[in-house]
Each structure stands twice: as C-alpha cells, then as structure tokens.
Amino acid sequence: MKPISIKDSWIGLDESGKGDYFGPLVVAGVQVDTELSARLTAWGVKDSKRLSDKRILDLEPMIRQACPHSIVAIGPERYNELYAKIQNLNKLLAWAHARTLENLLSERASPRAIADQFGDERFIKNALLEKGRQIALEQRPQAEEDPAVAAASILARAEFLKRLKRLSEEHQMDLPKGASDRVREAAVRLVRETSAEALKKVAKWHFKTTQQVLEASRPR
C-alpha cells in the first residue's frame, strides 16, 4: 500500500445488504487521495450496483491492497438485536457508518468524508465519536459517483456476498439475494425444515417478508 497524501485525502462510505432479506448489513469506508482516486477510476471502479458479482469480487482485493479501508459487518443475529433496540433502520445505518469512519480515523487522519444521504443527515453526525466529529462530513444523493464511495460500495458488497455464501453453506441451502418471491420461498422452506428461530440467524426479522413467511409456513 503506497502512502497517501493525508492533506489531499478523503474517505468514502457506503453500505450493502440494506435491502437484502438474508445476510448481514455491511458498511465499508475507503480512504483515497487524488492519485488513488484516478487509479480506481482507471480500474473501472464504480457503484457496485452497476457491476456483476464476479467483477465486484475481482476488484475487491485490488482495492483492499491499494487503499486504507475499514469494514463493519453486522450479522443477522446481531442486526436483529440492534434493530430491536433502535427501532429505526436509518439510525442503525448511521451507527454502522459512524463506527466504520471512527475505525478508519483511528488508524490515519483525513480532513473529510463523503457518504450517501439517507434519512435525516443528523443521524450520522449524532452517532460520530471524537475523531469523526473533527472532520467535514458531506452527505449527498448518488454519492457513489465519487471513486472513494464507489470503492467502499464494492468492499461492502464483496463482504456481503462472501458472508451470505457462508450462511448458505452453514444451513445447507441457497439463501438468495434481495427480497423476491424466490427469497420468500427459500425462507418458507427453512422454517418448515427447521424452525422460525432459525430464520433469525440468517434474515432481517423486521422485514415485512417475515410475516409473509410465517403465515405461509403454518400447517394447513
């Protein structure tokens, strides 16, 4: 990892798994300077939603090696515990963004950070700790257009994909991405073959999908 210019640097933050019923919520932070930003663009780094899973997994080690970064992954069980306490997805997201930023700033300084805007912009600022409060935090729509944020989206999605694969292997069944009919069918099968409690270990319980799955799983 080549040393970067701290004065000329900024941090990009993004998350993955927010809309996926199965799997964790992951937030990543990536620090770049002007030179690194140009290199990421040359590699084809862009919003992970515009890339295939294969391309995401190909780019991930390149970004990890080139850029200072931090990743906070909240597995389904922990996610469900936190949501039960916080009762607000945007506040939970803000907490994870703040932890990611604080972890990265504990290793190296940076004057500013950029994150996608979700909910009240005070959510992240209120969740920041000492180091995070000392930098300029910009929250804006479509922040993934910035190379640092795009790189963070790739690291977050790659971590999500790897953890979802491990959950699928542990439960010996395919746990699909998203929140589609296929996802509901997999969840119903899991409940019927195991229990509703098992669902809490792999899924985000507060999704409306849960009630649909539990109703469909009841004996007829």
Question: What kind of feature is each model-predicted range?
Answer:
Residues M1-R220:
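RNase H-like, Mg2+-dependent phosphodiesterase core
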